[in-house]
Amino acid sequence: EVHSRDKRIGTDVDMDTMAKATVGMAGADLANLVNEAALVAVRRGSKEIERIDFENARDRVVLGAQRESVIMTAEEKRATAYHEGGHALLATVLPNGDPLHKVTILPRGMALGVTWSLPQERHTYSKEYFEDTICKAMGGRVAEIVVFGHLNSGAANDLEQATSIARRMVREWGMSDRVGPQA
């Protein structure tokens, strides 16, 4: 709210939701986000910043610019939709992860699609939280196997994320029943 004081904000903007969607951003990042949202609103021809402007600005800042130059085949779009759907399904049904916020198959940054959860404000994380996060990360790969019977290269980042969390669970946090705590 500090960075939006001198801006005209639409009535559909919920600053609490925006705050949850920008956890971890520094003051300068938030100021940049508000300015980007104002630019999006101006391009839209609006005199006030609405929720959609904040969402588009946040997506651009956090996920990267939408890459309209990427031309996906119908099969690639279908595979991306099922892949992201796998992440979204698990984010919805697993009880210990962060809640699902947005799913898109519009290419952004280096990704062909994105499933985004809003992180809860926490200071510590449970073993169950990490297990659900790993499951969610692998959900896209599982969906590809179930629907298409094979994998493609689009899940590399998911595999990196899941592996990184699993390693840290064992090496740093002592969350392995088999290995046990170590120093």
Feature locations, PLM:
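Conserved AAA+ ATPase "sensor/coupling" helix adjacent to the nucleotide-binding pocket
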Residues: 1-9, 15-21, 36-41
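Alpha-helical structural elements of signaling/regulatory helical domains
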Residues: 9-10, 46
